[in-house]
């Protein structure tokens, strides 16, 4: 499954925190 998030990609610093938050929120490891 693919998940979408409402984030401003222009402010993205590539830190990966959004991906970690997404995994935590959706209880998934993939």
UniProtKB/Swiss-Prot annotation:
Membrane among keywords: no
Keywords: 4Fe-4S, Electron transport, Iron, Iron-sulfur, Metal-binding, Periplasm, Transport
Annotated compartments: Periplasm
Gene3D superfamilies assigned to the protein according to its UniProt record, in alphabetical order: 3.30.70.20
Expression induction: Fully induced in the presence of arsenate.
A Pfam family it matches: Fer4
Record-level GO cellular component terms: periplasmic space
Cofactor field: [4Fe-4S] cluster
Cofactor: how bound: Binds 4 [4Fe-4S] cluster.
Miscellaneous comment: May also use zinc as a cofactor.
Chain's role: Component of the arsenate respiratory reductase (Arr) complex, which catalyzes the reduction of arsenate (As(V)) to arsenite (As(III)). ArrB is probably the electron transfer subunit.
Entry protein name: Arsenate respiratory reductase iron-sulfur subunit ArrB
Organism annotation: Chrysiogenes arsenatis
Encoding gene, per UniProt annotation: arrB
